[in-house]
Amino acid sequence: MKTKVLLQINVTANWGSTGKIAEQIGLCAMMNGWESYIAYGRWCNPSKSHLIKIGNKLDMYMHYAEQRIRDNEGLCSRGATKRLIKLISEIRPDVVQLHNIHDHYLNYRLLFEYLNKTEIKVVWTMHDCWTFTGHCSHFITKGCERWKTDCFDCPLQREYPKTLFDRSKKNFTMKKNLFGANNNLTIIACSEWIANFVRQSFLKNKSIRVINNGVDLNVFKNSASLCTNKKIFQVLAVSNVWNKDKGFDDILNLRKILSSEYEMTIVGVTKQQLNSLPQGLVGIERTQNVQELVALYSKADVFINPTYADNFPTVNLEALACGTPVITYRTGGSPEAIDERTGVVVEQGDVNGLVEAIYRMKEDPLSSADCRKRAEKCFDKDKCFEKYVELYEKLI
């Protein structure tokens, strides 16, 4: 009997949030007797799956340069994608699991022209909105709704993936035709929030399911041995990238308002950002050291996530698993991670609301045990990612 084969495609492998999700899905598949491959564009950590590198640095730089001028993200890297397709035909996967196929490493037109001719089952997890727009990965920052009918004159032309010329109308039509033509496509949404958008997009007639992301509860757990100064209330913020959309400016403003009784730590800053942080804001560069992150989550009295554009942030789940309550903006699927016993939702951009929530959290702390219980009930990676494998088994 042929061993079932899973091939996942993502920009990273076991690196960053989507890369770690792919790694966990691969591990779960292997535990159920599957052979697992992960094809990736750049940045990886060691993996239990077979890794396939797509292209090289020159491919990436050429893709980036062409996209910056012509607005054709995902339509370059032709040679690299042809080589990937050759490998796909050799390993003959039963399921191709897509994650982020944008970010300068893959040609989605070539990939889908190939997949659409095969009987391979395709499962695509929506980590952002790029799949069903003509350009952007998150349209909520501009309140744009053109993606519901036909993208044109993109108001986010200067945002990722930034470009000189606007061809959002052509991109939208091409995506609609290519992705819509695949009769073996199943859509996974990480949150109810993004699922509702998919149901309004040109993918609305596809099978759409919601599977929340999960975290490793054996890794992300409270470090009880930590000794903290309880005279100082610890506020933590973590992100892979810090920019305006992630709430970096709001973090700076928050630091100006809070007194010295509150210590703020921000993880994931660049060297340049680190050197420009105001006094009283502790900066830590992006780290792949999980134990360091666990220690920071466990030390914190509250975790804040002032994001303006997000789907279902893994950092919220990691904080809860470490017993730390979450304060988040009402953005995307971020509020779905918490309930009234484990966090507070603040209206987007309301820095004073963040301050008030932090004050309340200090005066009347939420239960660390309740945070952990919610993580165990809803976001155990083994339970969450097992749902992917159950789906694969049904599809084949």
Where are these regions (language model features)?
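Carbohydrate-associated surface elements
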Residues: 193, 214
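Nucleotide-activated donor-binding/catalytic signature segment of Leloir-type glycosyltransferases, i.e.
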Residues: 268-294
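A short, well-ordered alpha-helix in the C-terminal region of glycosyltransferases
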Residues: 5, 366-390, 394
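Aromatic "clamp/platform" in nucleotide-sugar-dependent glycosyltransferases that forms part
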Residues: 308
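Short alpha-helical donor nucleotide-sugar binding micro-motif in glycosyltransferases
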Residues: 295-300
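Conserved acidic donor-binding segment of nucleotide-sugar-dependent glycosyltransferases
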Residues: 340-351, 359-365
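Conserved donor-binding/catalytic core segment of Leloir-type glycosyltransferases
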Residues: 188, 227-246, 252-256
